[in-house]
Curated annotation (Swiss-Prot):
HAMAP family: GppA (MF_01550). GO terms for molecular function: exopolyphosphatase activity; guanosine-5'-triphosphate,3'-diphosphate diphosphatase activity. Catalyzes the conversion of pppGpp to ppGpp. Guanosine pentaphosphate (pppGpp) is a cytoplasmic signaling molecule which together with ppGpp controls the 'stringent response', an adaptive process that allows bacteria to respond to amino acid starvation, resulting in the coordinated regulation of numerous cellular activities. Pathway: Purine metabolism; ppGpp biosynthesis; ppGpp from GTP: step 2/2. This is Guanosine-5'-triphosphate,3'-diphosphate pyrophosphatase. It comes from Pectobacterium atrosepticum (strain SCRI 1043 / ATCC BAA-672) (Erwinia carotovora subsp. atroseptica). The lineage of its organism: Bacteria, Pseudomonadati, Pseudomonadota, Gammaproteobacteria, Enterobacterales. Keywords: Hydrolase. GO terms for biological process: guanosine pentaphosphate catabolic process; guanosine tetraphosphate biosynthetic process; nucleobase-containing small molecule interconversion. The keyword Secreted does not apply. It is an enzyme of class 3 (hydrolase). SUPFAM superfamilies: Actin-like ATPase domain (SSF53067), HD-domain/PDEase-like (SSF109604). Its EC number is 3.6.1.40. It catalyses: guanosine 3'-diphosphate 5'-triphosphate + H2O = guanosine 3',5'-bis(diphosphate) + phosphate + H(+).
Length: 498
């Protein structure tokens, strides 16, 4: 039974939506128990004098009535409620906040834009893998936050008064998706970014992470259309052209774009186009968490792990009682194989990390049943919360585990979008071989195997006499050679001269 003392909640009164995150602390991380979101569009209720309309406030209060029931089970000192851009701006914010605090029975903190950027950065730092030096971008309903940092430490925090709701009302109020509206929206956003662009570019970040509904929508679109998960300027421009062809906001249809996100998608897209151009961003990926996760981790006072993915994999190993020594054995072998073929097969550090991750949890399916354990492993990975891994990376891990033994199914390898198909196939081949060679579960039985690449053909060179001395693994390798040949992956076995 869950103890209420292990429960934490964070509420974000945003300009477009109100969100509540309910979690519990587990093994130095947080486990999500509930996410509740209601489209309140508070910013749309601001008039020219920045007064909130009664209708907008009523929408907000009704939403908080829903939230308040869930909060009754959580200690008050383990709940944080913050308000952002619209309530920073509204001249009658006190009227809204007084009633809101009565409904929740909790204080509500109207945070500054810089504090919002800091919390967003912390949420990303605790949940998102990749290089330590990062730029974080969050396009909200009424403001856009930009934060740079290294590890857990922020180096620059910026909040700009432009958001997908305010830009919708300002530049797409006629509901026309014409090129002129996009141009005006982009130019206005670029103008707002110019005073801070140079200093942001100088921070030396290695990775750009997006933590907003706009970026989430883009990720869903790209997955639905079979693209890889990396957001780039050409992809954004392609989507803009598609939107322009739709002519009207009500007629906007893009594969993967949900009706819920469609209304503010063009305005968010215009802002993101401006950010990419002004900051010279090459690629962006989706964050694993943002403001609400930052609030929860702040209450827990947990340090930011140097390697979030390692923490996630270690948590899975403990939860499912995996043999960590065997995982390490397979990982070491697979890494050795990868380094031998990396140049010929163009396998970079990203491939190396994903292969290592698959090795660390390759036996997770055994926790359900030996029979069909690869399918069980794929299911568990596909449906687990894996901080540090993007949705596309989760899908690739599941696909690799599904294909770790037995006949090879090429379809899921071609349908994943974390890596080019040929790289994913090469990782699959190396994982399968490492599992075979490590099958006796002892370090002293691992042979010194040399790998030679000849196009797509892979030649394994074993110590003299090894195949005769190890008949079971020799038979497994012969079977593996046949299975790989069925999918046109030539695999040859030979022994070095005595």
């Amino acid at each position: 039974m869950l103890s209420s003392s292990s429960l934490y909640a964070a509420i974000d009164l945003g300009s477009n939506s109100f969100h509540m995150l309910v979690t519990r602390e587990t093994a130095g991380s947080i486990q999500t128990l509930a996410k509740i979101k209601r489209k309140v569009r508070l910013a749309a209720g601001l008039d020219k004098q920045n007064r909130l309309s009664q209708e907008a406030m009523q929408r907000g209060w009704q939403c908080l009535q829903l939230f308040s029931e869930r909060l009754q089970d959580i200690p008050q000192d383990q709940v944080r409620v913050v308000a952002t851009a619209t309530l920073r701006l509204a001249t009658n914010a006190d009227e809204f906040l007084q009633r809101a605090q009565e409904i929740l029975g909790l204080p509500i903190q109207v945070i500054s834009g810089e504090e919002e950027a800091r919390l967003i950065y912390q949420g990303v730092a605790h949940t998102t893998g990749g290089p330590d030096a990062r730029l974080v971008v969050d396009i909200g309903g009424g403001s856009t936050e930009l934060a740079t940092g290294i590890g857990a430490k922020t180096t620059q925090l910026i909040s700009l008064p432009m958001g997908c709701v305010t830009w919708l009302d300002r530049y797409f109020s006629d509901r026309n998706l014409e090129a002129g509206n996009f141009e005006r929206a982009e130019n206005a956003a670029r103008e707002m970014l110019r005073p801070v662009a140079a200093s942001l570019r100088e921070q030396g970040w290695q990775i750009c992470v997006g933590a907003s509904g706009t970026v989430q929508a883009l990720q869903e679109i790209m997955v639905a259309q079979g693209m890889d998960e990396y957001i780039t300027l050409p992809k954004l421009r392609q989507l803009k052209e598609h939107a322009i062809q739709c002519d009207k906001l009500e007629e906007l249809e893009i594969d993967g774009l949900t009706l819920e996100r469609a209304l503010v998608f063009p305005s968010g897209l215009a802002i993101l186009l401006a950010i990419f151009q002004e900051l010279d961003i090459k690629t962006m990926t989706l964050a694993g968490g943002a403001l609400r996760e930052g609030l929860v981790y702040g209450m827990l006072h947990l340090p930011v792990d140097q390697d979030i993915r390692h923490r996630t994999l270690a948590t899975l190993q403990r939860r499912y009682l995996l043999d960590t020594e065997q995982a390490k054995r397979v990982s070491t072998l697979a890494d050795n194989f990868l380094q031998q073929v990396a140049r010929d097969w163009q396998l970079d550090s990203r491939c190396r990390e994903l292969l290592r991750s698959a090795c660390m949890v390759h036996e997770i399916g055994l926790s359900i049943d030996f029979r069909q354990s690869p399918q069980h492993a794929a299911y568990l990975i596909r449906h687990s919360d894996l901080p540090g891994f993007t949705p596309a990376q989760k899908k690739l891990l599941a696909t690799l585990l599904q294909n770790q033994i037995n006949p090879i199914d090429l379809m899921p390898l071609s349908q994943q979008n974390a890596l080019p198909v040929n790289q994913a196939q090469h990782l699959c081949r190396l994982l399968r071989l490492a599992i075979i060679f490590a099958s006796r579960r002892r370090d002293d039985t691992l042979p010194a195997v040399r790998l030679r690449v000849e196009g797509e053909a892979l030649r394994l060179i074993l110590p003299a006499g090894w195949l005769a001395q190890h008949p079971l693994r020799a038979e497994m390798l012969e079977q593996e050679s046949r299975w790989q040949s069925y999918v046109h992956w030539p695999l040859m076995l030979e022994e070095a001269p005595a």
